[in-house]
A protein has these predicted regions:
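Short, surface-exposed, charged amphipathic helix/loop patches that serve as local interaction elements
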Residues: 30-142
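Low-complexity intrinsically disordered segments
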Residues: 1-16, 134-142
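Generic alpha-helical secondary structure signal
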Residues: 11, 23-24, 102, 121
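Short acidic-hydrophobic surface loop/beta-edge motif
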Residues: 16-31
C-alpha cells in the first residue's frame, strides 16, 4: 500500500496563471498586444458553469420527454470570464467604457474579432485541461 498522506491537498501542485494576448486590437504604447492573465479552471468551476448554461427542454413530438440543452455561446463566455484574472471583467468602469452591463457581454465586446474570440476560447479550454471543440469533432468523426 502507498502513503495516503501524499494525497492530501497540501501536497497538490497548483497550476500557475498564464498569459495570453486575446486580441490584437488592444495594444501597449509600443504596439504590442496586451496580455491577459488567465487561470486554469477547476473541475468544480467548469461543472458549475456548464450547469448554469444548461436547461431541460421538451422533445418535439414526444409528450412528457425532455432533453438537456446547453447554451454554448453563454458557456464559452462564462468560461472566459471565470478564467480571466486580469483585466477584471466585473469592473464597472471597464463595462461602461464598452457600453455593456455584464462580464459576459464585456468579454465579447473586448474580443470582437470572431477568429480571435474562438482562439481565446480554445486557449482557455486547453489551459484548463479541457478538450477543444475541434478535438471532440475529430474524435467523433473517427
Amino acid at each position: 500500500m502507498g502513503n495516503l498522506s501524499l494525497f492530501l491537498k497540501k501536497n497538490k501542485k497548483e497550476k500557475k496563471n498564464g498569459y495570453y494576448a486575446a486580441t490584437k486590437s488592444l495594444c501597449d504604447d509600443n504596439g504590442k498586444p496586451l496580455e491577459w492573465e488567465i487561470k486554469a479552471l477547476t473541475t468544480r468551476e467548469t461543472d458549475a458553469i456548464r450547469e448554469e448554461c444548461s436547461k431541460d427542454v421538451p422533445v418535439a413530438g414526444r409528450q412528457g420527454q425532455w432533453r438537456r440543452k446547453i447554451d454554448s455561446t453563454m458557456l464559452c463566455r462564462k468560461l472566459l470570464v471565470a478564467a480571466t484574472v486580469f483585466p477584471d471583467m466585473h469592473n464597472a468602469e471597464l463595462q461602461d467604457s464598452y457600453g455593456v452591463k455584464t462580464a459576459e457581454d464585456l468579454v465579447a465586446a473586448m474580443v470582437d474579432n470572431p477568429e480571435e474570440y474562438n482562439n481565446f476560447v480554445e486557449f482557455v479550454q486547453e489551459f484548463s485541461g479541457l478538450e477543444s471543440m475541434d478535438d471532440k469533432i475529430a474524435e467523433a468523426k473517427n
